[in-house]
C-alpha cells in the first residue's frame, strides 16, 4: 500500500474508489494499491 498525496491509475486494471472518505486505488497487481493521505 502506497500512501500518496495524489493517487493515479497505474494500469488499465486499476480502479479509483472512495472508502470512508478516503480515495483509494485497487488493482489486480498488489503493487498498485494506493491510498490518499
Curated annotation (Swiss-Prot):
InterPro entries associated with the record: Ribosomal_bL36 (IPR000473), Ribosomal_bL36_sp (IPR035977)
Key word Ribosomal protein present: yes
PROSITE patterns: RIBOSOMAL_L36
SUPFAM superfamilies: Ribosomal protein L36 (SSF57840)
GO annotation terms (biological process): translation
Any one GO MF annotation of this record: structural constituent of ribosome
Pfam families, sorted: Ribosomal_L36
UniProt entry keywords in alphabetical sequence: Ribonucleoprotein, Ribosomal protein
One cellular-component annotation, GO: ribonucleoprotein complex
Statement: the UniProt record of this protein carries the keyword Ribonucleoprotein: yes
NCBIfam families, alphabetized: rpmJ_bact
UniProt family annotation: Belongs to the bacterial ribosomal protein bL36 family.
PANTHER family the UniProt entry points to: 50S RIBOSOMAL PROTEIN L36, CHLOROPLASTIC, LARGE RIBOSOMAL SUBUNIT PROTEIN BL36C
Protein name: Large ribosomal subunit protein bL36
Amino acid at each position: 500500500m502506497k500512501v500518496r498525496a495524489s493517487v493515479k491509475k497505474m494500469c488499465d486494471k486499476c480502479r479509483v474508489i472512495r472508502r470512508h472518505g478516503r480515495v483509494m486505488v485497487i488493482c489486480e497487481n498488489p503493487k498498485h494499491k494506493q491510498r490518499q493521505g
